[in-house]
Amino acid sequence: GLRVEQGPTGHRHFDFAAPEVALLRQALQSTREAYRTPPTELDPMVGNVWYRQVGLREVGIRGEDALHWVEGLHEARLGREKLAEGWMKTLPPLGQAGRWHLDAEEVESFVATLNDHRLRRAAEFDLGEGDLEVRAMEKSKGDKRVALVEIHFLAWLIELVLQEQVK
């Protein structure tokens, strides 16, 4: 199964099974597309979790200030989109298990990208805490179930990436 090891310089080595590669590729690909989408054209639920439009209004940030804030966040996401393009090139091919290497300086962006995918999928299905329990996943069907599987898998992957290495 999935293993993540931390190297001496902070880089990570992953050992993936074929289905894990497929899931990660799918998550990165769809997140890259969403990153390239102008914030105003995103599903409003997604726009709100990624760009906090509602939150900005609540704290009185409006008009041009709000636009600059959202633009800044979008720029950061476009930067991650470029990184994700590189990750997809170096991941094992679809349908294959294999090892993968992530540089130390990209760990934070990788985790942020996976988290964005989780937030987006939860927003698309308007999932709350209760929906994220494993029992709820077992009962759900179709696209919602796929979203829940992705959310849980990526949470686990993030945990493995961030865990303190036991010496």
Question: What are the roles of these predicted feature ranges?
Answer:
Residues 8-11, 15-18, 63-75, 98-108, ...:
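Short, solvent-exposed segments of well-ordered alpha helices
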Residues 143-167:
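Helix-rich interaction surfaces within compact, conserved domain-sized segments
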Residues 34-62, 68-78, 82, 86, ...:
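Basic, glycine/lysine-rich polyanion-binding surfaces/domains
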Residues 1-32, 36:
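Short, extreme N-terminal leader segments that mark the start of a protein/domain
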Residues 83-102, 132-141:
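Short, charged/polar, low-complexity loop and linker segments
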Residues 32, 88, 118-122, 158, ...:
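A structural signal for well-ordered alpha-helices, especially hydrophobic packing surfaces
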Residues 33-42, 118-131:
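Extended intrinsically disordered, low-complexity coil regions enriched in Ser, Thr, Gly, Ala
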Residues 100-127:
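Hydrophobic/aromatic-rich, well-ordered segments within soluble, folded domains that form packed cores
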